[in-house]
Amino acid sequence: MSTRNLTMVIHRDYAQNHELGFAQNPTYLDDNSFVNMYLHHDGYPEWQGVQLANWIKANNDICGDSSRLAAKLVHDMYYDSCYLYCKPDEIDHQYTYVIWTGQADDMWISCYDQYNSQCIFVLTPNKIIKKYKKDMDYTDFEKHTKLTQRLKELERLINTN
């Protein structure tokens, strides 16, 4: 079974006047999202939450530019079960992650559980890593994209047989 997830990139200004701020249901902000990127596998916070946190840390130099960040996110996270949607409610998924942009020195990520209609977390990348990181083979975004790391793993497997 797959834990489906969607990642949105939204400027933090769209949360400032809402009573729940970054903890609100992100489907209400779909008109303000720079991207709605669906990933079919491993959407739980211990994987995708940490992946996004690691990715933000590796790309801190572009965190102030929402559109550039959204484009690079798709490039770096792409694999064969990655799709883009106009609206987040067009695809069934459990977790919606929002990367809140606008201040490169104060980045936040929220995780909303669509199945239970509740916010799981609103944390900085460092706090996500501290809380959720496990002994898993996360992508090293300083050196690879998700796809290039997978290709390198396949090449290694082929060469060992």
PLM features per residue range, with description:
Residues 4-9:
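Short beta-strand scaffold segments in enzyme catalytic cores
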Residues 10-15, 31, 100-103:
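Short acidic-glycine loop/turn motifs at beta-strand connectors
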Residues 16-68:
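Short, flexible N-terminal segments of the mature chain
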Residues 53-161:
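Low-complexity intrinsically disordered segments
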